[in-house]
């Protein structure tokens, strides 16, 4: 991966990431394609209509649904899904924990049963990379030990010790693969854990950065029960610990407000199910805030979802039509609503990037909140 810092405005950064399948411009939002597709959309929607640069795919689900050998035979996820741009694959560890009440975590990895058929499986740091090699994703995530919040200091200490150990094993394995001429196009990111505790975050970050050869670094373990202020404070003391010449990825976050604040604090990459999940549940994002499209007030509203939006849905359909489709449980609703919400998120990234390049990100941030009639958060964390 070739990383170029194209501009910086305060803490906000605009990078170019040259990956095997495509070049990615940051700040970037990655739509979540859990099982090889973004729900209700296909690869043409993603590339031609939304112009998405990179999609997140879930290692756990692809492993259980398809398996390593079939993924290899298909030539990886990009060929299988006919999306000729980049993919980031997560490690699948979170799903192994969260979807299996009896999952057992040891220093060697995670033992779990398939939520599909009850079959037994084991994820080691090395094996999750084997799955991601089969996916042939541009960016692979190491296996990490995520803790929910609040958690005891003892549990957080165990988490960062295990996370660092697994990261070291992953790095050694990845380097051995590259020495054999394998995995040369697959970049490996480490994940910084530590809850909202500055001491533990600093300790984990130092251990991972000192390993030296990761292609990027992620902040994990947020948006799991902490307040927004705790989230922003944690990001503010974590990003300075991350190398300036590597991309910074905030995992699983979040709301448009979360993303704008995190960009200001130096984060480059984001993913979240929120735009598509909210779309399926009648919540649509606009420049002026969220609307609940199933509400009766919209049943005769002939305006677009968002008058400032130029997405496919807003160009062709009205609020009244979307309200009708949702209330009628028409499947077309899910596509049109998902297209709108994802366009909103992706356009937010494009606007933020342009502001950074022009040196006007602070003014852009102010206008973002002014349209919503919201106070600008105090970012003196």
From Swiss-Prot:
Record carries keyword tRNA processing: yes
Region span, RNA binding: 252-258, 276-280
Catalytic activity line of the entry: 7-aminomethyl-7-carbaguanine + guanosine(34) in tRNA = 7-aminomethyl-7-carbaguanosine(34) in tRNA + guanine
Pathway: tRNA modification; tRNA-queuosine biosynthesis
Gene Ontology biological process terms from the UniProt entry: queuosine biosynthetic process; tRNA-guanine transglycosylation
Active site annotation, chain numbering: 90, 271
Cofactors that this protein relies on: Zn(2+)
Entry's cofactor comment: Binds 1 zinc ion per subunit.
GO cellular component: cytosol
GO MF, one example: tRNA-guanosine(34) queuine transglycosylase activity
Keywords: Glycosyltransferase, Metal-binding, Queuosine biosynthesis, Transferase, tRNA processing, Zinc
EC identifiers of the protein: 2.4.2.29
Residues where substrate binds: 90-94, 144, 193, 221
Alphabetized InterPro entries for the sequence: TGT (IPR004803), TGT-like_sf (IPR036511), tRNA_ribo_trans-like (IPR002616)
Gene3D superfamilies with a match to the protein in the record: Queuine tRNA-ribosyltransferase-like
Binding site for Zn(2+): 309, 311, 314, 340
Family: Belongs to the queuine tRNA-ribosyltransferase family.
UniProt function note: Catalyzes the base-exchange of a guanine (G) residue with the queuine precursor 7-aminomethyl-7-deazaguanine (PreQ1) at position 34 (anticodon wobble position) in tRNAs with GU(N) anticodons (tRNA-Asp, -Asn, -His and -Tyr). Catalysis occurs through a double-displacement mechanism. The nucleophile active site attacks the C1' of nucleotide 34 to detach the guanine base from the RNA, forming a covalent enzyme-RNA intermediate. The proton acceptor active site deprotonates the incoming PreQ1, allowing a nucleophilic attack on the C1' of the ribose to form the product.
Subunit structure comment from the entry: Homodimer. Within each dimer, one monomer is responsible for RNA recognition and catalysis, while the other monomer binds to the replacement base PreQ1.
Protein name from the UniProt record: Queuine tRNA-ribosyltransferase
Source organism (scientific name): Helicobacter hepaticus (strain ATCC 51449 / 3B1)
Taxonomic classification: Bacteria, Pseudomonadati, Campylobacterota, Epsilonproteobacteria, Campylobacterales
């Amino acid at each position: 991966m070739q990383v170029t810092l194209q501009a910086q405005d305060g803490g906000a950064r605009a990078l170019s990431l040259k990956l095997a399948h495509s070049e990615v411009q940051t700040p970037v939002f990655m739509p979540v394609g859990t099982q090889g597709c973004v729900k209700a959309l296909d690869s043409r929607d993603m590339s031609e209509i939304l112009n998405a640069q990179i999609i997140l795919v879930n290692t756990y689900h692809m492993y259980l649904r398809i398996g390593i050998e079939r993924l290899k035979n298909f030539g990886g996820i990009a060929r299988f899904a006919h999306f000729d741009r980049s993919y980031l694959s997560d490690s699948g560890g979170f799903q192994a924990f969260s979807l299996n009440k009896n999952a057992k975590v040891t220093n060697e990895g995670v033992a779990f049963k398939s939520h599909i058929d009850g079959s037994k499986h084991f994820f080691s740091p090395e094996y999750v990379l084997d799955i991601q090699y089969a996916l042939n994703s541009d960016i692979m995530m190491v296996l990490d030990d995520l803790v929910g919040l609040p958690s005891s200091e003892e549990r957080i200490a165990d988490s960062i010790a295990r996370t660092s150990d697994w990261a070291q094993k992953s790095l050694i394995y990845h380097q051995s693969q590259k020495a054999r001429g394998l995995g040369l196009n697959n970049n490996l990111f480490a994940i910084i854990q530590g809850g909202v505790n500055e001491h533990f975050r600093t300790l984990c970050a130092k251990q991972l950065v000192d390993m030296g050869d990761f292609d990027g670094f992620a902040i994990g373990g947020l948006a799991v029960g902490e307040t927004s202020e705790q989230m922003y404070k944690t990001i503010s003391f974590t990003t300075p610990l991350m190398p300036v010449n590597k991309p910074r990825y905030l995992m699983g976050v979040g709301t448009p407000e979360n993303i704008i604040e995190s960009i200001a604090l130096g984060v480059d990459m984001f993913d979240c199910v929120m735009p598509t999940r909210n779309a399926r549940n009648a919540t649509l994002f606009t420049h002026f805030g969220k609307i609940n499209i199933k509400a009766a007030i919209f049943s005769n509203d002939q305006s677009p979802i968002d008058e400032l939006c130029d997405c496919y849905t807003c160009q062709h359909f009205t609020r009244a039509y979307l309200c009708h489709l949702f209330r009628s449980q028409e499947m077309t609703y899910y596509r049109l609503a998902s297209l709108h919400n994802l366009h909103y998120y992706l356009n937010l990234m494009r606007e933020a990037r342009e502001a950074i390049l022009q040196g006007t990100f602070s003014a852009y941030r102010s206008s973002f909140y002014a349209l919503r009639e919201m106070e600008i958060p105090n970012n003196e964390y």
